[in-house]
């Protein structure tokens, strides 16, 4: 059992995202960057799940009978495409306002998604297991990364996959994700990111390995200002994604 007197929730982060929850499904709003690079990360997730679970990548519903957990799901930007691909999806977020928005949008699109207002540590203590866990752009917002990874790892089935996307702790990431995105371009509200919470890939790999998770792939996701697009890259200096497998 995980000690729930300890928490992964950072109240200031929770308050911040609660204030802007109504913006989740506005592609030109405060979550514009997520909408922009969502297709890139979705393509990667689909490709790797099909490869590791031996699914037909051209099938309309390749994730049929797979159970997916999206932690820190926000308004459901990842949950909805996972459900459309056939997965049984559970989306959790500590912010009730985010879950409210996600539920309404799913209902409007006739999608069956199990949304819950809870934390990783509380859910882990319920004993539920998943084939795939998505920790996308969330570890840089939690209060205790080690506790968070420990809790999420406990919910992963043997040979299950965990996708973890976050920001590297480099001056380049500080300049792009904070100074550029928040203060100059104003893509994101000021205060969205805290540089001290950014993680170097080796640090994140260490947290994963301590919890019986082996990194089997890694990519960077970079922005091209010439065509206003996001693409996979070997450059992990700013945004990066690790794919880990449970032993």
Swiss-Prot record:
<keyword id="KW-0949">S-adenosyl-L-methionine</keyword>
<dbReference type="GO" id="GO:0102208">
    <property type="term" value="F:2-polyprenyl-6-hydroxyphenol methylase activity"/>
</dbReference>
<feature type="binding site">
    <location>
        <position position="93"/>
    </location>
    <ligand>
        <name>S-adenosyl-L-methionine</name>
    </ligand>
</feature>
<dbReference type="InterPro" id="IPR029063">
    <property type="entry name" value="SAM-dependent_MTases_sf"/>
</dbReference>
<protein>
    <recommendedName>
        <fullName>Ubiquinone biosynthesis O-methyltransferase</fullName>
        <ecNumber>2.1.1.222</ecNumber>
        <ecNumber>2.1.1.64</ecNumber>
    </recommendedName>
</protein>
<comment type="pathway">
    <text>Cofactor biosynthesis; ubiquinone biosynthesis.</text>
</comment>
<keyword id="KW-0489">Methyltransferase</keyword>
<dbReference type="GO" id="GO:0032259">
    <property type="term" value="P:methylation"/>
</dbReference>
<dbReference type="Pfam" id="PF13489">
    <property type="entry name" value="Methyltransf_23"/>
</dbReference>
<keyword id="KW-0831">Ubiquinone biosynthesis</keyword>
<comment type="similarity">
    <text>Belongs to the methyltransferase superfamily. UbiG/COQ3 family.</text>
</comment>
<dbReference type="GO" id="GO:0010420">
    <property type="term" value="F:polyprenyldihydroxybenzoate methyltransferase activity"/>
</dbReference>
<dbReference type="GO" id="GO:0061542">
    <property type="term" value="F:3-demethylubiquinol 3-O-methyltransferase activity"/>
</dbReference>
<comment type="function">
    <text>O-methyltransferase that catalyzes the 2 O-methylation steps in the ubiquinone biosynthetic pathway.</text>
</comment>
<feature type="binding site">
    <location>
        <position position="72"/>
    </location>
    <ligand>
        <name>S-adenosyl-L-methionine</name>
    </ligand>
</feature>
<feature type="binding site">
    <location>
        <position position="41"/>
    </location>
    <ligand>
        <name>S-adenosyl-L-methionine</name>
    </ligand>
</feature>
<keyword id="KW-0808">Transferase</keyword>
<feature type="binding site">
    <location>
        <position position="136"/>
    </location>
    <ligand>
        <name>S-adenosyl-L-methionine</name>
    </ligand>
</feature>
<dbReference type="InterPro" id="IPR010233">
    <property type="entry name" value="UbiG_MeTrfase"/>
</dbReference>
């Amino acid at each position: 059992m995980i000690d729930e007197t300890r928490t992964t929730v950072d109240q200031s982060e929770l308050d911040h995202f609660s204030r802007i929850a109504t913006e989740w499904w506005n592609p030109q709003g405060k979550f514009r960057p997520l909408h922009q690079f969502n297709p890139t990360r979705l393509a990667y997730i689909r490709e790797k799940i099909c490869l590791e679970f031996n699914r037909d990548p051209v099938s309309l519903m390749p994730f049929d009978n797979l159970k997916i957990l999206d932690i820190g799901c926000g308004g459901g930007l990842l949950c909805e495409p996972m459900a459309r691909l056939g997965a049984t999806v559970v989306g959790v977020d500590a912010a009730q306002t985010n879950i409210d928005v996600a539920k309404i949008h799913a209902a409007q699109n006739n999608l069956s998604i199990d949304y819950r207002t809870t934390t990783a540590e509380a859910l882990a203590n319920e004993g539920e297991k998943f084939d795939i866990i998505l920790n996308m752009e969330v570890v840089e917002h939690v209060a205790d990364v080690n506790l968070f990874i420990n809790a999420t790892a406990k919910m992963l089935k043997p040979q299950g996959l965990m996708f973890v996307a976050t920001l590297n702790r480099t001056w380049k990431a500080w300049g792009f994700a904070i100074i550029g995105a928040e203060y100059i371009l104003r893509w994101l509200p000021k205060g969205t990111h805290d540089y001290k919470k950014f993680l170097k890939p080796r640090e994140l790999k260490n947290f994963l390995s301590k919890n019986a998770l082996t990194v089997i792939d890694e990519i960077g996701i970079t922005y091209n200002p010439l065509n206003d697009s996001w693409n996979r890259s070997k450059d992990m200096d700013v945004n990066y994604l690790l794919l880990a497998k449970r032993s």
